[in-house]
């Protein structure tokens, strides 16, 4: 029997650096894990106002809150099975201009609340680039491909940040999900996601986000 209820809350504790600037973020979220819907309110508690675009942090809070993904019955849900022991993930983000982010997450559960401890490191963002100039305008919807390897779930996808004045800033995401106990492994599949910032103050020290996340088999399989 699953320990995950139809409605859950979660807490986010994130700390890290971007081009040497230290910051901390805390958040409170809620949603419906089996429907793939979630919202979160986030606050920069240290290091604000941030001298870089919020958008490089936003996926770590929701495309990071992986239990809130709607799975069909014929695809085993690797992440939900991992509880109550929980799971971890590690991520590398390679941007087209040579900037790199490494991220880790430790996800646990207590009652009807998930807790996410996130560590973030961003390096080599050009001072005149869209991240340090805060010229990004949110992520396009995307699809992550997922496959099993060595008891872990490997995710890979290309994501695109919209830019002021048009165009995109591209980034390749590689994520490794690791359950803290043996679980039934899914086959090759995809997760479609749409992440939006729905509200924020002027300097992005207070941000609200929502995400829809749905797993599926390949369309032409």
Swiss-Prot record:
Domain of life: Eukaryota
Effect of residue 158 to H: Produces a homodimeric form
Crosslinked positions (2-iminomethyl-5-imidazolinone (Gln-Gly)): 62-64
SUPFAM superfamilies reported in the protein's UniProt record: GFP-like (SSF54511)
Key words, A-Z: Chromophore, Luminescence, Photoprotein
Modified residue annotations for (E)-2,3-didehydrotyrosine: 63
Gene Ontology BP annotations: bioluminescence
InterPro entries recorded: GFP (IPR009017), GFP-related (IPR011584)
Post-translational modification: Contains a chromophore consisting of modified amino acid residues. The chromophore is formed by autocatalytic backbone condensation between Xaa-N and Gly-(N+2), oxidation of Tyr-(N+1) to didehydrotyrosine, and formation of a double bond to the alpha-amino nitrogen of residue Xaa-N. Maturation of the chromophore requires nothing other than molecular oxygen.
Biotechnology: Fluorescent proteins have become a useful and ubiquitous tool for making chimeric proteins, where they function as a fluorescent protein tag. Typically they tolerate N- and C-terminal fusion to a broad variety of proteins. They have been expressed in most known cell types and are used as a noninvasive fluorescent marker in living cells and organisms. They enable a wide range of applications where they have functioned as a cell lineage tracer, reporter of gene expression, or as a measure of protein-protein interactions.
Assembly and binders: Homotetramer.
Remarks, miscellaneous: The wild-type form is non-fluorescent with the color being pH dependent, ranging from yellow at low pH, through red to blue at high pH. The His-142 mutation produces a fluorescent form.
Similarity-based family: Belongs to the GFP family.
Known role: Thought to play a role in photoprotection of the coral's resident symbiont microalgae's photosystems from photoinhibition caused by high light levels found near the surface of coral reefs.
Protein name: GFP-like non-fluorescent chromoprotein
Lineage: Eukaryota, Metazoa, Cnidaria, Anthozoa, Hexacorallia
């Amino acid at each position: 029997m699953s320990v995950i209820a139809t409605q859950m809350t979660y807490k986010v504790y994130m700390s890290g650096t971007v081009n040497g600037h230290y910051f901390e973020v805390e958040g409170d979220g809620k949603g419906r894990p089996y429907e793939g819907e979630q919202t979160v309110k986030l606050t920069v508690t240290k290091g604000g106002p941030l001298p870089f675009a919020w958008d490089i942090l936003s996926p770590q809070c929701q495309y990071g809150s992986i239990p809130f993904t709607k799975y069909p019955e014929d695809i085993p849900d690797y992440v939900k099975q991992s509880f109550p022991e929980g799971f971890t993930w590690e991520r590398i983000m390679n941007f087209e201009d040579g900037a790199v982010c490494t991220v880790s997450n430790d996800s646990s559960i207590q009652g009807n609340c998930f807790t996410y401890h996130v560590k973030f490191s961003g390096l080599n963002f050009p001072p005149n680039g869209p991240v340090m100039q805060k010229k990004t305008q949110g992520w396009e919807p995307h699809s992550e491909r997922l496959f099993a390897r060595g008891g872990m779930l490997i995710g890979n996808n290309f994501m695109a940040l919209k830019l002021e004045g048009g165009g995109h800033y591209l980034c390749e995401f590689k994520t490794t999900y690791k359950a803290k106990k043996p679980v039934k492994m899914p086959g090759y599949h995809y997760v479609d996601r749409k992440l939006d910032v729905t509200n924020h103050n002027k300097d992005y020290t207070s941000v609200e986000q929502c995400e829809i996340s749905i797993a599926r088999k390949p369309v032409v399989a």
